[in-house]
């Protein structure tokens, strides 16, 4: 993992916690860790093969997480959720009645799957789970992975556990 991170990090620093999470995901083969590493490379301003995901954003919903940011990374298993969100966002131009009278299943499937995915990628709006990091003085500190069901307190506790490695983050991770 350290060798791969060495290729993807320009000035950023990566916590031992995140390194362990990546190693576990690689060993279990439950994530393509290279997709995560490519997102880190993108955040570092390096050439990247990363999927067109949403831009990095600060955590705004909870003051506890102020100063932390998250960046989506995409995995194939997130495809259905992305397609579902996209098809809800953009209704079909044809009416249901018109389709019922002359069903063109191939066109419908294409629009539901390929069309929705193309729209989402064109807008760089793919979503997935998160890389949690803290930008400070031009350096990104990559702390942990999280998902939509990881509670804010847990994200904060994981991030705060990295203070022994990165004491300079104390102002960001104030309690």
Regions found by a protein language model. Give the residues of each.
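Hydrophobic/aromatic beta-strand elements that line small-molecule binding cavities or substrate pockets
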Residues: 131-132
């Amino acid at each position: 993992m350290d060798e791969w991170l060495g290729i993807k990090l320009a000035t950023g620093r990566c916590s031992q916690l995140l390194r362990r999470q990546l190693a576990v995901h690689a060993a279990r083969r439950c994530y393509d860790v290279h997709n995560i590493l490519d997102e880190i490379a993108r955040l570092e301003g390096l050439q990247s093969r990363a999927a067109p995901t949403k831009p990095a954003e600060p955590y705004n919903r909870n003051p506890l997480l102020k100063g932390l940011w998250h960046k989506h990374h995409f995995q194939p298993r997130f495809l259905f959720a992305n397609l579902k969100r996209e098809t809800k966002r953009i209704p079909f131009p044809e009416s249901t009645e018109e389709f019922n009278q002359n069903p063109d299943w191939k066109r419908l499937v294409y629009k539901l799957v390929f069309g929705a995915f193309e729209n989402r990628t064109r807008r760089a709006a793919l979503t997935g789970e998160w890389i949690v990091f803290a930008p400070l003085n031009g350096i990104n500190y990559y702390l942990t992975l999280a998902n939509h069901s990881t509670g804010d307190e847990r994200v904060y506790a994981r991030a705060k556990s990295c203070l022994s490695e990165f004491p300079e983050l104390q102002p960001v991770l104030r309690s």
